[in-house]
C-alpha cells in the first residue's frame, strides 16, 4: 500500500506541475488514515464492548524442525489466497488502464509483472512468518520483561526497541528515498531516519508509561496532536506533509506485528486491561513523528535563514 500510494502522490503532483509541486507530493498517506479511523469509530458506536475480552496468542510448542516446517506449511495456503485477493484489484485496474490509455511497451510490462510477482511472494512469506512466529514472539518477550520485579525497565527498553524497530520498517526506507529524491537532497535519508527513530522511541516509552500506570490514551493523543497541528503554522509546507506521511508510514507492518504484541504481553504480565491500556500503541507511533519531523523542519528553517543572512553579509562585504 505505502509504495503504491506514495508513487501515486508523486506522479499526480508531477503531472499537475506548478512551482510548489514538490510540496504536494506528500500527505496522501495521511489522508488515507481518515477513512479507517472514522469507520472503526462508527462501528464502536454500535458495539457493546463491556463483555469484550482478549486471548493471548501462545507460541506453538515445537520439538524439531519437521514440526516447525509443518506450522509454516499449514499457514502458506491461507496467505497465498489472502494476498492474491488483496493484490487482484490493483492488477485488474492496471490492466484496464493499460488497454484504455497507458499502452506501455512489452519491456515495461515485463518489468511491472516481475515486480508484482516479487510483491506477491514477499507478502506471502511475510504474513506467514508474522502469524506463525513473529507476533507470538512479541507477546512472549513483552510478557517476560513485564514479569520482572522492576516494571519501570519497560519504559527505557520500550523506547530503545521502538527506535530500532523503525529502522527495520521497509516502508520507512521507501519514504526516506522519496523525500531525498523529491527535495534534491535538502532533506537527507539520514536526517529523516534519526527524526523517525526519536519519534517512534518516544511513542513506545509513552506506551509503556500507559501500560504501567493505566493512563487514558486521550491524555496523550489530544495534547500530542494539538502540538502537531500547532507546528504546521511555523514550518514549511513540505515538512508538514512529510511529517503526516511519516507518522502513517512509521506505524507499518513492523509496528503492528511486533510492537503491538510486545505491548500486549507487557500489559498482560502487569495485570492491566489489554483493550484499554495496550491498544493504541500504533496511534502513538503515528503521532510522535508528526512532532519530531516538524521540529526538524523548524531547525531547517532557522539554519536556512542563517545561511541566507551570511550570504547577504558576504555579498555586502564583497561589494
Region spans (language model):
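Hydrophobic alpha-helical transmembrane segments of multi-pass membrane proteins
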Residues: 1, 80-87, 113-116, 120, ...
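Signature of multi-pass transmembrane helix bundles
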Residues: 1, 18-148, 152, 275-285, ...
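Transmembrane helix-loop boundary segments of multi-pass membrane transporters
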Residues: 1, 78-81, 110, 129, ...
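Short helix-coil transition sites and intra-membrane helix breaks within transmembrane domains
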Residues: 1-2, 85-86, 126-135, 162-173, ...
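Helix-loop-helix junctions within the multi-pass membrane cores of secondary transporters/permeases
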Residues: 3-30, 34, 38, 151-232
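Transmembrane helix-loop junctions at the membrane interface of multipass transporters and ion channels
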Residues: 10-19, 43-51, 208-210, 262-276
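Hydrophobic membrane-spanning alpha-helices of multi-pass integral membrane proteins
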Residues: 31-36, 122, 198-203, 251-264, ...
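C-terminal membrane-solvent junction of multi-pass transporters and transport-like membrane proteins
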Residues: 232-261
Amino acid at each position: 500500500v505505502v509504495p503504491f500510494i506514495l508513487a501515486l502522490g508523486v506522479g499526480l503532483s508531477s503531472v499537475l506541475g506548478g512551482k510548489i509541486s514538490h510540496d504536494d507530493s506528500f500527505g496522501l498517506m495521511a489522508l488515507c488514515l481518515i477513512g479507517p479511523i472514522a469507520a472503526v469509530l462508527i462501528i464502536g458506536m454500535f458495539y457493546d464492548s463491556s463483555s469484550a475480552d482478549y486471548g493471548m496468542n501462545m507460541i506453538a510448542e515445537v520439538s524439531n524442525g519437521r514440526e516447525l516446517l509443518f506450522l509454516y506449511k499449514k499457514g502458506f495456503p491461507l496467505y497465498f489466497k489472502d494476498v492474491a485477493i488483496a493484490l487482484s484489484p490493483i492488477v485488474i485496474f492496471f490492466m484496464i488502464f493499460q488497454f484504455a490509455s497507458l499502452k506501455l511497451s512489452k519491456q515495461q510490462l515485463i518489468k511491472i509483472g516481475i515486480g508484482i510477482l516479487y510483491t506477491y511472494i514477499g507478502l506471502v512469506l511475510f504474513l506467514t512468518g508474522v502469524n506463525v512466529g513473529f507476533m507470538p514472539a512479541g507477546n512472549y518477550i513483552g510478557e517476560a520483561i513485564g514479569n520482572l520485579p522492576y516494571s519501570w525497565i519497560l519504559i527505557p527498553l520500550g523506547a530503545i526497541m521502538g527506535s530500532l524497530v523503525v529502522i527495520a520498517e521497509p516502508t520507512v526506507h521507501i519514504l526516506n528515498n522519496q523525500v531525498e529524491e523529491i527535495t534534491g537532497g535538502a532533506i537527507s535519508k539520514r536526517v529523516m531516519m534519526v527524526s523517525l527513530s526519536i519519534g517512534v522511541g518516544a511513542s513506545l516509552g509513552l506506551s509503556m508509561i500507559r501500560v504501567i500506570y493505566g493512563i487514558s490514551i486521550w491524555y496523550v493523543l489530544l495534547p500530542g496532536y494539538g502540538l502537531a497541528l500547532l507546528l504546521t503554522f511555523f514550518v514549511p509546507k513540505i515538512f508538514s506533509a512529510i511529517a503526516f506521511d511519516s507518522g502513517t508510514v512509521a506505524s507499518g507492518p513492523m509496528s503492528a506485528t511486533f510492537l503491538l504484541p510486545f505491548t500486549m504481553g507487557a500489559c498482560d504480565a502487569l495485570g492491566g486491561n489489554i483493550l484499554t491500556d495496550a491498544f493504541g500503541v500504533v496511534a502513538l507511533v503515528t503521532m510522535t513523528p508528526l512532532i519530531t519531523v516538524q521540529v526538524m523542519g523548524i531547525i531547517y528553517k532557522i539554519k536556512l535563514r542563517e545561511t541566507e543572512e551570511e550570504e547577504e553579509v558576504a555579498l555586502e562585504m564583497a561589494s
